[in-house]
Amino acid sequence: SCRKLQNKNNSLREEIQSCLLRDILLQRADGTLCSLEKLVSGKRSILAFLEIGAEPTEHVLNEVLALEKSAKGNSKGIGCQLLFVLRQEKDLQHKTLQEVLALDAGSEIEILYDISGGASDANAAPRTAIGDTASGTLCGWQETAKRMRLAEKLPVLAAVRPNGTGIYGTCGYHVGSVELMVRILKEAVRTEAD
């Protein structure tokens, strides 16, 4: 259920896919539960499942920080909402993440926790919204990686249209991946308007 949308006239358009993402359950920092569908409804989004403390995530956060600094003064920030999905509450204290959150460059940034079920890594016990052991279900980052045809390697990032369709994804870290996602989301809006 993932198809690549191609247009030979524009290489950026060649990167755009159309993957229906599963509606996973996430928990906001204030403890309320929210579906991915509701979070992205009407908004271009970058969904980022982060592994705080790991080198690839540090690169992603530094890239977001640089983009946010360059967008400072623009009322819409980088032009899309950033949904940072953390593994645990203590991850919120991470220095670079705190720098991104403190910058307040106009982008809408939301901190979330994945409670959709499944294990956050191979050694962790699966958990659900009520803290019980899940029965073999994938957690949100694994499900998103699978739907976007990515390796199961954190961080997992997905550019998501306002209708909940994933249009570009990456895992691990690739230089410029966040900036590319911002550009792809802007191009997708232009493509829809054509």
Model-derived segments and their meaning:
Residues 116-184:
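Thiol/disulfide oxidoreductase modules built on the thioredoxin-like
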Residues 39-41, 77, 104-105, 149-152:
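Extracellular/periplasmic catalytic domains that process cell-envelope and extracellular macromolecules
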Residues 49-51, 85-87, 162:
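Cofactor-binding loop segments of dinucleotide-utilizing enzymes, especially the Rossmann-like FAD-
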Residues 58-60, 183-194:
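Short, solvent-exposed cationic patches
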Residues 2-37, 58-63:
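N-terminal "domain-start" segment that seeds a small globular fold
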Residues 35-60:
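Short active-site neighborhood of thiol/selenol oxidoreductases, capturing the structured segment around
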